[in-house]
Amino acid sequence: MPDSKPWQGPWKAHRLRLKAHRGPLFYASLQWELFAWLRRHEGEIDAIWCNDLDTLAPAVWHGKLPVVYDSHEYFTEAAGLTGRPLRRAVWLTLERWAMRRLSCMITVNESIAAAYRNKYGRDVAVVRNMPRRQPRVCVKGREAFLDHGVPTDLPIALMQGAYMDRDRGAAQAVAALPEMKGVRLVLVGAGVEWDEASARLDDLEMEGRLHCISKLPFDQLRRLTASADVGLSLDQAGHGNYEMSLPNKLFDFMHAGLPMVVTARKEVAAIVREHELGEVIEEASPVAVRNAVMKVLSMPKSDWQASLNAASEQFHWGVDEPHIERILEQSLKAHLADNQTK
């Protein structure tokens, strides 16, 4: 993609150059390039790990290697397919065709796993997308926000998201800001609702308390998160994917020691309530958001740290990482056994 950053991961990576960057042509280009790459390198590959439904067809069509389907969301119930029956039917057809040909499937939480088990009658493992356990970021005052031009004279409510699509809650957070007197709202990320918020920075009703920061490297985002006063996760109902989602920002807030206000989506609300990490609201009306934010801010941030620290010890990558090796081993064995019976 044109805005892709240079790869800095610990393993070798190959980037595909696509002829289209959006719409149906993007997906068609992606499928072709993936399939062509697999054909060129098939002698070098032992197994294929597919992230989400839009990478699955070339791997399954290739047909010669074990395929692990890693579904990061309930793809066919995503917001982008709501109200688009033809597009959704295409993806559902692909999903049904591929499911019978997988070696293994994993997803990010038990709710989505249960939905797939009920739908296709197959085993689905759960590997949650949680951060590694590491020392908490040490921040000096609010310098991280000052570095991005955000004054630190008021408490800061933070919402972050790589892509703030419709109904991810950014619009609701902005609508609530006039009600949240004495609070600054910072949106970090990109997307449709981030763009709309950016266009309202000078609105009189925002009183100069709305701030938008473009997507940041993870280390910089961690510093901002640790420096904020309350985190917001306001996914809306109406899409099966959002209803069952377990967004990364929940764990980012947790590991940064940041109390949070969340909407009552199933997985998120259960964790926040059980571990006393903040406030859960049934709907993200301006008044409900304001009341919850003010309730969290009425307690010193230090008072939340015991429950946040305890949750961080329970929810981290070290808990689920061992499942990866087990899943790959099972997939390879199943593939070999299947080939021997043919």
Map each language-model feature to its residues.
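Conserved donor-binding/catalytic core segment of Leloir-type glycosyltransferases
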Residues: 150-168, 173-177
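Nucleotide-activated donor-binding/catalytic signature segment of Leloir-type glycosyltransferases, i.e.
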Residues: 196-224, 230
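Membrane-proximal helix-turn-helix segments that form the acceptor-binding/catalytic region
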Residues: 32-42, 57, 61, 69, ...
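Conserved acidic donor-binding segment of nucleotide-sugar-dependent glycosyltransferases
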Residues: 274-275, 279-286, 294-301
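A charged, aromatic-enriched C-terminal amphipathic alpha-helix characteristic of glycosyltransferases
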Residues: 284, 298-330
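Acidic donor-binding loop of glycosyltransferase active sites
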Residues: 103, 209, 225-243, 258
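N-terminal strand-loop element at the rim of the active site
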Residues: 1-26, 111-117, 126, 191-192, ...
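Donor nucleotide-sugar binding/catalytic pocket of nucleotide-sugar-dependent glycosyltransferases
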Residues: 76, 88, 92-142, 146-147, ...
